[in-house]
Amino acid sequence: MRTLERLEALLGALPSGLLEVRLRSGKPAQYRCADGERFGEVIPPERLRAILAALADHSLYAREAELKQGYFTMDDGCRVGVCGRLVCDGERPTAMADIGSLCVRVCREIRGACDGFYGALFEGKSLRSALIVSGPGLGKTTALRDAARRLSEDGYNVCIADERHELAACAQGVPALDVGPRTDVMDGCPKHIAVTRLLRAASPQVIVTDEIGDRRDAEALQEAARCGVRILASAHAGSLEQLAARRNVYLDVFDLAVLLGDEPGRVKEIRAL
């Protein structure tokens, strides 16, 4: 059962154009839609726990490793963020306890989501590496997925390092989302490990990955670039100036940055790096 079907069974009829569901203990359900916000009924603490259990297939233990990071990903690519009391051993998270809220981000396949920048990926016949940049919830993952599909359809061997299971939503190793006919996916492991394995195993022409952030990710992508592989990736930033202050994110791997606009699917700026 897909995530929206599960939520509808748990919460009743959902509004159309749904992008995100936020459920907070003792507060009204909040629905963020393409045309604005809606609010639903109050979610008591015991019901919030029941909804979390149902989304996790009544096996929170199996999701323990993900929950320590504050989220888990559904089989169709939707991500369930979990907030509450995080139990730590020093600086190492060991468990998520006393759940206070859930944030379900709806995974969407939108053909054409990359149209605003796809042409800029090419300089003549040469493909360039690009970093897709925006704040949260403005379509970076959707645009990356669509670009991977289109490059794959256009003849490139594409590899996806899908740490959070959101780009391809693999089930038993097979993508549930359309990422193209020439695409291979390594999912469920840290990006820097996946990139290294893909270089060895799949002879990629293009590597696609989501939300790079630390130096290990950037160094793995730098090694891929040295091998002649083009990179498409995303990073959180509110502006290209903010991005420039975080050189560790891209380490000269990328030829251009694409800043998405204030609405999903809109491109605000494309700049050479």
Question: How would you name each of these model-derived features?
Answer:
Residues 1-76:
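N-terminal accessory targeting/assembly segments
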Residues 60-127:
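P-loop NTP-binding catalytic core
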Residues 85-98, 256-273:
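Conserved P-loop NTPase
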Residues 130-132:
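Hydrophobic anchor at the beta1->P-loop junction of P-loop NTPases
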Residues 140:
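Conserved lysine of the Walker
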Residues 143, 147:
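Hydrophobic positions on the alpha1 helix immediately C-terminal to the Walker A/P-loop
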Residues 151-198:
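P-loop NTPase switch/communication element
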Residues 202-263:
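Conserved P-loop NTPase nucleotide-binding/switch module
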